[in-house]
């Protein structure tokens, strides 16, 4: 199993290109099942989760072809993928494939909407809380699907197609909104999605569906209206920049000091996180084609933060921000409101010398003067990159084990950091 070795202490200097967002690319790829025509997606990151989803789509009979890159992308970053679901041979998504990644469960929506049936294994993947699929299935039932659980599989059917309906989510759910959008796009009549997620990745999916012929209004607000159509066509769409990768590298710069320009990204995708970062004393400047992050002199100030759905502070940046706060001046209180069991990184940060106390959904972080390198173990995707951030500032060497988590969500991480002066290397098993 691969390991990453980091010798801390070097400030980051230079430029980092931001990849396409995995959390946008996955639902966009799944949406290709809604049509028999070709959907071409540009700026798709090269990640383990992308490869896993291509295998799942291939199992259904979807053809895919990698056709090129965007100008400026290197051999290790970015790709353009053409997906054609003109010969879907199977509407079953088996356990051995779905268990590798939670988002693959979303194939239930386009399979059901287009073919009238889907049999999809209950999901696996990330170990963050329970993440139930109840809200996703509720949305499909509201649209007229019959749902059964049989032997660990969700069996969804509709006799005469899905029909437009009002879907009211009791809490904001990104996955539920993705599923509702895809299913409602081919439903008969009008669907109204209340308490819809407003995340940029939801907006990106709706933009692609619109190019395919869907009729969608209100995306980016809590109320989305979808007028169903009888068929969708092909489209070309570029995946939006990864706001979580953007925030991660911004926090790495704040942690180590230095001056880095994050290219190919947009500040409006993560205003809340950048505002919090600025409050710590880090200089954040929006540029026409990116963001400049700079911190010189004194360390960062302690800041309290609470995770919230977009446009609030992203839960996917909570672990990274906690790593930054381990060396802040004073005490920081970090409250996690989205997922339970999302403090698994705390124990590993403590191995580096961090002082963190947990009380339910609250983490209290007392900043320390220095961290010291040690062997640590990644427990999930965001926790693993928080250890990278801490390791970049720790004295001596930090060895991160189980880095396959990183490969699920961060494209060419060692290369991007290394080009900015980080002493980081991968030891391959």
Swiss-Prot record:
The modification 2-(S-cysteinyl)pyruvic acid O-phosphothioketal is found at residue 126. Signal peptide: none annotated. UDP-N-acetyl-alpha-D-glucosamine binds at residues 102, 131-135, 316, 338. It is found in: Cytoplasm. Its EC number is 2.5.1.7. One of its GO terms (biological process) is regulation of cell shape. CDD domains: UdpNAET. One of its GO terms (cellular component) is cytoplasm. One of its GO terms (molecular function) is UDP-N-acetylglucosamine 1-carboxyvinyltransferase activity. Phosphoenolpyruvate binds at residues 22-23. The keyword Iron-sulfur does not apply. The active site is at 126 (proton donor). Cell wall formation. Adds enolpyruvyl to UDP-N-acetylglucosamine. Belongs to the EPSP synthase family. MurA subfamily. This is UDP-N-acetylglucosamine 1-carboxyvinyltransferase. The lineage of its organism: Bacteria, Pseudomonadati, Pseudomonadota, Alphaproteobacteria, Hyphomicrobiales. The gene is murA.
